[in-house]
């Protein structure tokens, strides 16, 4: 199996060492298991699995790193090959340096209808660990009394799938 991670899919202005590190370590893991792993610093090259740090949306700017991400996703899909997308920790606002190294991994997309988050068999204790690590407190769902549930996301977030906010 040939796995290629795309270092040029990271913005040139990036100052976060975690972004290239995760791509390089992914490749190291592939190599340890006897497969071909390449941390690639160029344009698209066919592979069994491509690895991207971050995703590209329909309305994303036409910058070189985002154009490469789009090309990788499109070419891999056209060849019926896989793409792993490594994306940011949803709770970065609580741990700006991501000291616990929480990241999101999906295959072939980031939307519920296009991506696979490998969540068919979730560990029921996982949320307890994440919430304890990051100091997140939630309340049980309440059916008595007057309560309002407000669900928010940033403009252009993935779950809107093109709908206006």
Residue ranges of model-derived segments:
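Charged/polar, solvent-exposed surface patches and flexible loops
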Residues: 25-28, 129, 162
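N-terminal pre-catalytic "stem/leader" segment of glycosyltransferase-like enzymes
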Residues: 1-59, 156-157
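A structural signal for short, well-ordered beta-strand segments and their strand-loop junctions
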Residues: 5-6, 37-40, 50-52, 74, ...
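Conserved catalytic-core segment of nucleotide-activated headgroup transferases in glycan assembly
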Residues: 142-165
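Residue-level preference for short coil/turn positions at secondary-structure junctions
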Residues: 45-46, 79, 143-144
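Short amphipathic alpha-helical segment that frequently serves as the phosphate-/nucleotide-binding helix
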Residues: 17-24, 66, 70, 165
């Amino acid at each position: 199996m040939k796995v290629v991670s795309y270092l040029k899919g990271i913005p040139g202005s990036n100052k976060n060492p975690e972004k290239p590190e995760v791509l390089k370590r992914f490749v190291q893991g592939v190599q340890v298991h006897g497969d071909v792993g390449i941390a690639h610093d160029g344009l698209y090259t066919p592979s069994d699995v491509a690895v991207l740090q971050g995703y590209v949306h329909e309305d994303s700017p036409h910058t070189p790193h985002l154009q490469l991400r789009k090309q990788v996703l499109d070419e891999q899909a056209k060849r019926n090959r896989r793409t792993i997308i490594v994306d940011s920790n949803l709770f970065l606002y609580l741990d700006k340096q991501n000291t616990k190294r929480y990241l999101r991994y999906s295959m072939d997309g980031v939307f519920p209808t296009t991506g696979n988050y490998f969540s068919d068999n979730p560990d029921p204790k996982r949320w307890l660990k994440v919430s304890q690590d990051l100091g997140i407190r939630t309340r049980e769902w309440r059916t008595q009394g007057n309560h309002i549930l407000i669900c928010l996301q940033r403009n252009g977030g993935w779950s809107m799938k093109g709908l206006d906010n």
